[in-house]
A protein has these predicted regions:
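Short, flexible coil/linker elements and helix-boundary hinge sites characteristic
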Residues: 15-16, 20, 35-37, 41, ...
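C-terminal basic regulatory modules in eukaryotic proteins
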Residues: 48-87
Length: 87
């Protein structure tokens, strides 16, 4: 199971102050990680499935400038942080 506190702490350490980060888990083991750019108020959402360990992003999220120029190059870092935060 993903330790939300640990994941948030590690993601914040890596991405603050560029993005504010929120994590929310549903009852199916899927956690939504929201990266909000305070300058533009745009939110980019990633999904992490604890059952398959897959990190996904919807095509409409990939089109956002904040993803293309702010997060895209860091997807491997994000996946590693999430995997390291599993218990």
């Amino acid at each position: 199971m993903l330790n939300l506190d640990k994941a948030k702490e590690r993601l914040c350490k890596r991405f603050l102050p560029d993005f504010n980060i929120k994590l929310k888990r549903n009852d199916k083991g899927v956690t939504t990680i929201s990266f909000k750019d305070d300058d533009t108020n745009v939110v980019v959402n990633l999904k992490f499935n604890e059952n398959t360990l897959a990190t996904t992003i919807a095509p409409r999220e990939m089109e956002k400038e904040e993803f293309r120029y702010g997060l895209k190059d860091h997807m491997n870092d994000i996946k590693q942080i999430l995997n390291e935060s599993l218990e």
